[in-house]
Amino acid sequence: MPDKGNIQLDTLQHQDHSQETASRYGGGSQLPEQERLDTNIQDDPVEYPGLIRVILITLGVALCSFCVGLDNTILATAIPKITSEFNSLEDMSWYVSAYLLVTSAFILSFGKIYTYYSVKWTYLVSLGLFELGSLICATTPSSAGLIVGRAISGMGSAGIFPGSVIILSNIAPLHQRPLLTAFIGIMSGIATVTGPILGGVFTDRLSWRWCFYINLPIGGVTAVVVFFFLKTTKVKKNVPTSHKIKGLDWIGTVVFIPAIVSLLLALQWGGARYNWQNVRIIMLFIIAGVLGIVWLLIQCWKQEEATIPPRLMQRRSIVGTCVYTIPFVGCVIVFGYYLPIWFQSVKGVSASQSGIMNLPTVVGTIVVGLLSSVIIMKVGYMVPFLVLGSVLLAVGAGLCSTFQRSSGSAEWIGYQAMIGMGSGLGYQLPLLVVQADVPAADVPVATAVVIFMQNLAGSIFSAIAQTVFQNQLAKSVQILVPSVNPKSILDGGTVGLSDRFPSDVLPSILQAYNTAVTHTFYAGVAAASLSVFGAFIVRWNVT
């Protein structure tokens, strides 16, 4: 039987947030103006829609999450054709960076916007921006237009995924959300894995522009469902607009955007366009660090009007999920990118075949994600599943790091499945943890924090993995095939190795690739192992 201090899933959503906030000010009934503003979101009794509406809304936002997931990876196989059509090889990195930078820069701001304004209309505006960006990308006659379109889509993406999670919190009680959240996460995960495959199919069979056209009808379905079936959240009309605008923390946002852009540019350019000792990379890190410190000071100064109120970061569950999310998602990102590289380079299969060989990860994520959601709905406790997710992910990552050129299907299927099971357990659960631990009025900001950490993890660990891979590949080639210039291998890409190298050196080249990829997997092993410490920071009785 749960302890008396436990937070019960079926009653948490109905807690009186006003009593909690009042207690912080001496137990009186008069709360500061900004605190009263925060409580406007959920101060009315919660009325959840019927089953049919819940299913339709969940399917609608899941479809949109699928599109957002696709946009993260679908260009991986389309970029060569795009750069060839526009003669824009120098712009190649911006096709990905423009989307990622804008998304990461505005996610936290959308957390505050969802706090003060209608969830329904904020989500629809975000979806409109995403669709507009996709339309521009699909029809643009120039490389510059594609970059602009990607940036606009990134702005919309910043509001879509946190909005999807917040919508779920408005249509279902907490004890029913694990299954819905898992479904959203699974759709996004499937899109991320299948993105390169679809990008290749569209590029080869139709046109790379269909990588963006596909978003338009799917987004249209989501817009119709949300418009007609999601009720508009109530916001008190007596709250002055000036208070809402002030609460969006414009000063913090102006400082935060260049800070995160500088950090992400340093991570993306370091080791790729410039070496890590280059003055440009060093200056970007310095700018990011200085502005980051200034932003933290602004958060302490603004308090309740900050982008992230400091009191939220004093909660163990918020800190724990952040510590958990960065390395956990980092590990998933490493294997999401480098397992296909291992299949295509070492095993010599095509991009579409590597996608099929990646199915054990996808199936493991789907099956365990859904099963664990049902179990959590029954037992209530979340932390044990966070721990188990870290353990399974670390073990699967460790086993994958033993891959050899001769490794058979039993090995890469079984080891991948374990990674998928770990991912299914731990990838989306931090979102439920923060929803269970924070007052209802703080759910939008807390959700945005976790999703921002997921994006940040992708940037950090993709940079780490790229550096490890390139350095180890160059080192292995110098040792195994000293007659071959390592730069020629790095510049030539990871596919078609058997066509580029003679048979007498090909086995050594393949061994060098195997060594480079498995050493990159070590970064994933370390990350998954570190994530378990974040799970232990979370209060055990968060249910």
From Swiss-Prot:
GO cellular component, one term: plasma membrane
Location(s), subcellular: Cell membrane
InterPro entries assigned: MFS (IPR011701), MFS_dom (IPR020846), MFS_trans_sf (IPR036259)
Keyword Ribosomal protein (UniProt): no
Membrane topology: Multi-pass membrane protein
Molecular function via GO: transmembrane transporter activity
Pfam family, one: MFS_1
Regions that span the bilayer: 50-70, 94-114, 128-148, 151-171, 182-202, 210-230, 247-267, 281-301, 323-343, 356-376, 379-399, 413-433, 445-465, 517-537
CDD domains named in the record: MFS_Azr1_MDR_like
Keywords for the protein's UniProt record, in alphabetical order: Cell membrane, Membrane, Transmembrane, Transmembrane helix, Transport
Main localization category: membrane
Region (Disordered): 1-34
Its biological purpose: MFS-type transporter; part of the gene cluster that mediates the biosynthesis of the indole diterpenes penitrems. May be involved in the efflux of penitrems.
The protein's name: MFS-type transporter PC-17
Organism: Penicillium crustosum (Blue mold fungus)
Lineage of origin: Eukaryota, Fungi, Dikarya, Ascomycota, Pezizomycotina
Recorded name of the encoding gene: PC-17
